[in-house]
Amino acid sequence: MSPALPLDPIETASRDELAALQLERLKWSLNHAYENSPVYRRKFDEAGIHPSELKTLADLARFPFTTKKDLRDSYPFGMFAVPQERVSRIHASSGTTGKPTVVGYTARDIDTWANLVARSIRAAGAKPGDKVHVSYGYGLFTGGLGAHYGAERAGLTVIPFGGGQTEKQVQLIQDFRPDIIMVTPSYMLSIADELERQGIDPATCSLRIGIFGAEPWTNDMRQAIERRMGIDAVDIYGLSEVMGPGVASECVETKDGPTIWEDHFYPEIIDPETGEVLPDGELGELVFTSLTKEALPIIRYRTRDLTRLLPGSARTMRRMEKITGRSDDMMIVRGVNVFPTQIEELLLKQHALAPHYQIVLTKEGPLDVLTLNVEPCPESAPDATALSAAKQALAYDIKALIGVSAVVNVLPVNGIERSVGKARRVVDKRKSGQ
């Protein structure tokens, strides 16, 4: 068996060594943003703070937040901090409304990104000679190219498939026999469905490791994927505004939440309502400051992702708890805060039902109605009695454990539209009156 790929030396540095590096790089990043981005200069001046006032890492809390709105208001290149001729690549995330969020990279930024995704792939257990099947979308989305260049930087063979064409994906997985797949967890389930449709047991295919990201997914989902595919499933975290995939990633030996690559990104957890910085271990909104980015430095960027910071385990760098949801993904149903991942956890306990689901929110007069569309599990082939029992049990659990009533509809197999990227888990029709 080939040995695992070696770690970067910084991954085993002491906390004191890491903190010293973070402070040095943080001072550079704040100065770079202030001196070269008019948007940041204005924000800092309005807040009455200057980069020279940062003496300790804790002083970062005195600086203003950056939000997605800031990026959209400066569309397309208003927050860039280098001349256009130094921008080597542009990516963008579309969002649901309005103009896309545009991010830029210098050649050095792209080099750093490739190194961090390579580090993430090594942390997942990659070995020399491994082949990586990339099913993230290519193009303006950061997933495909981020995974691609990271796998190449790690010295691995890349199969640059991209999203969609599930039958073709399965054919190439069978023919090319990749060891690693990088994809959204929801699309991994679609690939597993297609393998089974073709009469192939997913656990017999060549894949050894799945590196899953771009959408929240639960530990119950991890166990379901691992059981079905016969692989190690690890979580990679990132967002285009901060860099793309590879901001943090799980280590295969622990699978206890993504390790944040703290030599390039400084994390904070804040109270999403007050903006107050919370101590490690408390649940709140994740905030990132880039320490080395040139084209688009990010200062205290509010990700809207909800998690908590935890001590390092497989590495000395801190971990983040698996994302439980986003503050802007939260549904308020009859006054109760509900996250899709809560419903997912309950669904996965019903073995007669598949892990595919969609939540539809409507109004019945003044009252909210939550409808949960699910499918039978093809593997267990439940009869009508088993499906009825699972449906009733799921509705009971949602009411008992989350506190809202749900109408559970069992659709035919493949009755829920499959996504080649991020799954559309929630359809809110309340405002439209549909």
Annotated model-derived regions:
Residues M1-A92, T97-N115, R119-A123, K127, ...:
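Nucleotide 5′-phosphate-binding alpha/beta core
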Residues S2-D8, F63-V234, V242, G246-V252, ...:
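Active-site phosphate/ATP/adenylate-binding loop shared across adenylate-forming ligases
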Residues I10, A203, T259, K322-R326:
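Short, flexible turn/loop "capping" segments at secondary-structure junctions
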Residues V158, A233, P267, Y357-I359, ...:
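Generic structural signal for residues in well-ordered beta-strands
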Residues F161, I236-G238, I270, T362, ...:
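Conserved beta-strand termini and adjacent loop/short-helix elements that scaffold enzyme active sites
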Residues I181, V287, L291-I402, G421:
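AMP-binding/adenylate-forming catalytic core of the ANL superfamily
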Residues R208, W217-G312:
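Conserved AMP-binding/adenylate-forming
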